[in-house]
Amino acid sequence: LTAYPLNPTFRSASRKETSGIPYTQEELDSLSQEYYDFTKYLLSNYQDSKKVFSIMPVVTMDRWLSGRDLASDESPGVCTESDSAPKARIDNMIAYISTISNAIHRAAQENSASKSKVYLTCEINSFTCAQNNPAIKQAINSVIPHAGCDLVGLAGYELLYYSSTAHRNDPNFLRQAFNYLASQAPDHPDFPGGKNIVISEVGLREQQGTQSDADWFVNTFLKT
């Protein structure tokens, strides 16, 4: 479920994770209440169904942190420390995600008799710069380790670009990429051994790229 905040109190401030202006406690409280109520509704309404819900409150997190949209920017350029997301944006994103995380987990604890599950999924869309140079701050190494995400989703546009060009003949590239993502995500008791990485968007765009690239990526992706 892609679930953006609906509360008017918070929606008026929803761009602050981009601007870097700190959230007020009132804004965070309204955010917390909304996701607590939503999680409680899911767990109580579907308590006997054994359904699993994945709530994703922000998509392509790196676009919000750095302003770079890798869905259209197929050549991110060189990886330098100037590519790092500003600290103020990182701090705001951690505050935003961790507030939602605490609300979801509090509701889950209070409704532990429910047979359904609700997990917080945090989607990133860029990580190769941080993988190659840890000094570069992206969502995967600056937000994910601290925000309380249950699952880490990957929007794979950047991964598709690199794997089908510079790393086309490297059979280990995708595996190394997934292993890196797992190394940055905190362990989760429901997904032991770093198994809390999910593919939220494969990254194949219609009518762009060649069919052979798409076929190669999908086949390699599934094998990995």
Language-model region placement:
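Short, flexible loop/turn elements at secondary-structure junctions
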Residues: 3-7, 61, 124-128, 156-158, ...
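Glycoside hydrolase catalytic-domain groove-lining segments
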Residues: 132-210
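Solvent-exposed, acidic/flexible segments
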Residues: 24, 28-32, 86-97, 133, ...
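Substrate-binding clefts and catalytic carboxylate motifs of secreted carbohydrate-active enzymes
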Residues: 206-224
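Aromatic-lined carbohydrate-recognition surfaces of secreted/lumenal glycan-active proteins
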Residues: 52-58, 90-136, 190-207
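Generic structural signal for well-ordered alpha-helices
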Residues: 32-43, 90-108, 174-186, 218-223
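Substrate-binding cleft and catalytic face of glycoside hydrolase catalytic domains
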Residues: 1-89, 108, 114-116, 159
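Acidic (Asp/Glu)-rich catalytic clusters
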Residues: 1, 41-49, 109-113, 139-148, ...
